[in-house]
């Protein structure tokens, strides 16, 4: 009797890992004011994304929808494949917001203990105190903590549920330079273990240094989305820097291809579409020295892409 080779069993399909954030066609208005106008945003697990835009661009309104604090008029949003509120209830999402949410008359440790009681399972209190850099003030009343210390307490509270997604809205407000550095070192360490981070900030240097990806909003829409290098390349031109005592800014601004001139002490910076020609002029026609050519910085790109972002957008919500 002829034998038949066994047919190998077909392996069950592997379920695709849902993105941390999947927002499609988000629209939100407040009366006659259009705050968000058709935002599409997908954030993969493990990304660190800077969410930038001037006041009134729609960032905070978008973040509110990602957190389930408000509902879009149109469009859909999912967090790890669930509704935002379900994801938060399951401890998958935490947020560090700018203000509010702290009881002034209890200690830092008591605040964390109270917050931990809301979850079935949390990281140890001492662990999140250390991670947030506030172990030494654990017994201090919240009301006597500085603004930066209170912000780090909010960070510790957000870490309790060990969330897969951490949303930060101006997280380093009130922190000094050293506090900001320590905070971002902690964020980077957590992200290295796979946590997704989405943060809004007005400190463009933070976005430049710590983000894998930058999403830029203007007038309720996403106008740019990419790596820092990709975003910088969206604006043409270079910046020519030089030391030029007594520089005639009017004459420099009148040079062909020069868009603007900035001066700080003896240093000048010329934003130009023809950096070679400008550098040649400075070296041959002036007493300039220490001439260097650089790409546009993130601030220049930010201003170029957002422009005067204050018409027909949200006024009270940034």
For the regions a language model picked out, list residue spans one by one.
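ABC transporter nucleotide-binding domains
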Residues: 18-23, 28-199, 204-218, 224
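Short, flexible active-site loops
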Residues: 213, 235-237
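Short acidic-hydrophobic catalytic motif
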Residues: 229-234
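Short, charged/small-residue-rich alpha-helical element at the C-terminal edge
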Residues: 237-312, 318
């Amino acid at each position: 009797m002829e034998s038949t080779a066994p047919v190998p069993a077909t392996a069950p399909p592997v379920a695709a890992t849902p993105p941390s954030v999947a927002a499609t066609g988000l629209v939100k208005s407040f009366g006659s004011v259009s705050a968000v106008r058709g935002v599409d945003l997908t954030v993969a697990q493990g990304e660190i994304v800077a969410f930038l835009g001037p006041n009134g661009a729609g960032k905070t309104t978008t973040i509110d929808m990602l957190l389930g604090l408000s509902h879009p008029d149109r469009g859909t949003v999912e967090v790890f494949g669930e509704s935002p509120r379900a994801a938060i209830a399951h401890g998958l999402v935490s947020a560090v917001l700018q203000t509010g949410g702290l009881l002034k008359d209890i200690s830092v440790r008591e605040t964390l203990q109270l917050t931990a009681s809301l979850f079935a399972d949390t990281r140890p209190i001492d662990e999140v105190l250390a991670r947030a850099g506030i172990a030494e003030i654990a017994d201090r009343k919240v009301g006597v903590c500085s603004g930066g210390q209170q912000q780090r307490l909010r960070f510790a509270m957000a870490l309790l549920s060990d969330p897969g997604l951490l949303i930060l809205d101006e997280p380093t407000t009130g922190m000094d330079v050293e506090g900001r550095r320590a905070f971002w070192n902690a964020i980077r360490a957590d992200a290295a273990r796979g946590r997704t981070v989405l943060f809004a900030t007005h400190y463009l240097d933070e976005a430049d240094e710590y983000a894998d990806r930058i999403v830029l909003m203007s007038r309720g829409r996403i106008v740019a989305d990419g790596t820092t290098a990709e975003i910088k390349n969206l604006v043409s031109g270079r910046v020519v820097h030089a030391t030029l005592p007594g520089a005639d800014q009017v004459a420099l601004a009148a040079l062909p291809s020069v868009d603007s001139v900035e001066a700080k002490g003896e240093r000048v910076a010329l934003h130009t579409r023809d950096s070679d020609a400008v550098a040649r002029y400075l070296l041959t026609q002036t007493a300039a020295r220490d001439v260097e050519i650089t790409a546009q910085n993130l601030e220049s790109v930010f201003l170029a892409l957002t422009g005067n972002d204050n018409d027909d957008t949200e006024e009270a919500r940034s």
